[in-house]
Amino acid sequence: MYPGSGRYTYNNAGGNNGYQRPMAPPPNQQYGQQYGQQYEQQYGQQYGQQNDQQFSQQYAPPPGPPPMAYNRPVYPPPQFQQEQAKAQLSNGYNNPNVNASNMYGPPQNMSLPPPQTQTIQGTDQPYQYSQCTGRRKALIIGINYIGSKNQLRGCINDAHNIFNFLTNGYGYSSDDIVILTDDQNDLVRVPTRANMIRAMQWLVKDAQPNDSLFLHYSGHGGQTEDLDGDEEDGMDDVIYPVDFETQGPIIDDEMHDIMVKPLQQGVRLTALFDSCHSGTVLDLPYTYSTKGIIKEPNIWKDVGQDGLQAAISYATGNRAALIGSLGSIFKTVKGGMGNNVDRERVRQIKFSAADVVMLSGSKDNQTSADAVEDGQNTGAMSHAFIKVMTLQPQQSYLSLLQNMRKELAGKYSQKPQLSSSHPIDVNLQFIM
């Protein structure tokens, strides 16, 4: 949902005139200092000097003075403990009586991505799957919009859950992970627009073939009018930093320019967006259906699917999902009429030889749920991803998409999406 209406949101601070360091000590030293040490050394002192100029002309923030104070509420943020998280992910995760293979068995005839350079059929455009054997870096962003009337409850929990997921099972070191959340005292780690952009630049800086980069965003998302003609629905997808009211959102074109364009062939970026209207939030040119084929826009098919979901939600008494499905139908029809986008031209422009894969929480015309799962506030998409990958780590691209949709079906109207920077064989093993 769109997070902003009115100016007086954060503690009725009006224009906010800036960020002040809170008087109290950090609420949780476990996450305050230990991760992303290189990031701290590289950007902690000279934040904003190097790469701001690169994007300031094309993506200028709104006019007016920058904010001066961020008065964070005095109540503590959601508490998170590693042991608690393992138990809360699912009542059956570590239960020996639960047979994970019965729920999400490994796909048949699954193979690892080939190391050789590939070529798009009928063209000379090369691309390369990453083997994910090089350096690992991650950027994790969770924004609850604390103290605002648009406050979310599960995004900071999502950030810490993803942190533990990466460090416990996928070889990511805390020294190479940056977490931005709006419950922190360290101003470098508050998810302002400037901090988020610089952290994105840090994530992809000096990446080499077979490196594995991971981006997770949990927070508000929305849409704004598309000005460069690259969107089928006429709308750009955006995400909202904590200071979006004064500094503006971050649009999909900008994130593509920062995190996709600079990557070399063979560099892996796995992006997970748990936000509304996030289907094409990285502007990747290839989107895949649950049948494993590249999707082409078909608004009437989407309307039919949303209508079926609405009927199921009505029959089960799920009012929130019913409203979401009906809203999705309206946005699909409204956005799909009268747009004539040169799809092949857009694919050529947005293509990347790097190995960029995105899992998003919903279609461009859908909202994503702030949910309660296993007794914990969480984003529905983040919870589904961790649950599926924990129960069965050996997933193909296709089975991962299908199983995440199964996790959300019936409870939520949103449909997770899979997109990529180049054509992918969806039957290959999903690695990161």
From Swiss-Prot:
Disordered: annotated segments: 1-70
SUPFAM superfamilies (UniProt xref): Caspase-like (SSF52129)
InterPro entries documented for this protein: Caspase-like_dom_sf (IPR029030), Metacaspase (IPR050452), Pept_C14_caspase (IPR011600)
Family the entry assigns: Belongs to the peptidase C14B family.
Entry function: Cysteine protease that cleaves specifically after arginine or lysine residues. Mediates cell death (apoptosis) triggered by oxygen stress, salt stress or chronological aging. Regulated cell death can prevent a release of toxic cellular components, thus avoiding necrotic collapse of the colony, and can also provide nutrients for healthy cells. Therefore, regulated cell death in yeast colonies can be as important for their development as are apoptosis and related processes that occur within metazoa. Promotes the removal of insoluble protein aggregates during normal growth.
Low complexity bias spans: 1-14, 29-59
Additional remark text: Present with 1400 molecules/cell in log phase SD medium.
Subunit structure: Monomer.
Annotated signal peptide: none
Enzyme class, spelled out: hydrolase
Pro residues biased stretches: 60-70
An example Gene Ontology biological process: protein quality control for misfolded or incompletely synthesized proteins
GO cellular component, one term: nucleus
Assigned EC number: 3.4.22.-
Residue segments, region Prion domain (PrD): 29-131
Source organism of the structure: Saccharomyces cerevisiae (strain ATCC 204508 / S288c) (Baker's yeast)
Site description Cleavage, residues in chain: R72, P73, K86, A87, K331, T332, K334, G335
Pfam families tied to this protein: Peptidase_C14
Compartments, as annotated in UniProt: Cytoplasm; Nucleus
Origin superkingdom: Eukaryota
GO molecular function, one term: calcium-dependent cysteine-type endopeptidase activity
Inhibition and activation profile: Activated by Ca(2+) which induces self-processing and is required for the activity of the mature enzyme.
Gene: MCA1
Consequence of changing K86A: Prevents auto-cleavage at Lys-86 but not at Arg-72. Does not affect catalytic activity
Catalytic residues in the record: H220, C276
Protein name per the record: Metacaspase-1
UniProt note: domains: The prion domain (PrD) is a Gln/Asn (Q/N)-rich domain. It targets the protein to insoluble protein aggregates.
PTM characteristics: Proteolytic cleavage of the propeptide appears to occur after Arg-72 and/or Lys-86; it is not clear how the processing takes place. Proteolytic cleavage after Lys-331 generates a large (p20) and a small (p10) subunits. The small subunit may be further cleaved to give rise to a shorter product starting at Gly-335.
